[in-house]
Amino acid sequence: ALRKVDRNRFVLDNVTPQPREAKRYKEEEEFPGHGRRRRRRSKGKGKAKGKGKGKGKRRRRRKGKGKGKGKKKGKGRRRRCRRGRGCKKRKGKKGKGRRRRRGKKGK
C-alpha cells in the first residue's frame, strides 16, 4: 500500500527492497587443473543499438486524391520491385478505395 510521507510523496511499504544484483564483472571461477582465476564478466551492453534506417524505411503518408494535392516527392531510391498498390502479388492487396456515388446522372 502507499504510505504518505510528505505532502506529495508516497512510499510503498509492503514492498521489501530487493537485494541489488551483485557486481557482475569480477568473479572467481574454478578452472580444473589451472586453479582459480578472476574473470571479468561484462556488465551487459544494455539495449542493442538499432540498425540505422535507410531513406526508404521512413514512412510517408500516401497522399490521397482529395484534399489538395501536396508536393509529390521524387522517385527516390528504386527498390527491386516497383509493385504499386494495385498489384495482385502484393501482400497488402489493393483496397477498393472510397467508391464515389455519382447519382443517376453521371453513370
Curated annotation (Swiss-Prot):
It comes from Bolinus brandaris (Purple dye murex). One of its GO terms (molecular function) is DNA binding. GO terms for biological process: cell differentiation; chromosome condensation; spermatogenesis. Residues 1-107 are annotated as: Disordered. The keyword Cell inner membrane does not apply. Residues 34-107 have a biased composition (Basic residues). The keyword Nucleus applies. Protamines substitute for histones in the chromatin of sperm during the haploid phase of spermatogenesis. They compact sperm DNA into a highly condensed, stable and inactive complex. Residues 1-10, 20-33 have a biased composition (Basic and acidic residues). It is found in: Nucleus; Chromosome. Its main location: nucleus. Keywords: Chromosome, Developmental protein, Differentiation, DNA condensation, DNA-binding, Nucleosome core, Nucleus, Phosphoprotein, Spermatogenesis. It comes from the Eukaryota. Coiled coil: none annotated. Residues 1-35 form a propeptide. The modification Phosphoserine is found at residue 42. GO terms for cellular component: nucleosome; nucleus. A series of N-terminal cleavages yield the mature protein. Only the mature protein is phosphorylated. Gonads. This is Sperm protamine P1.
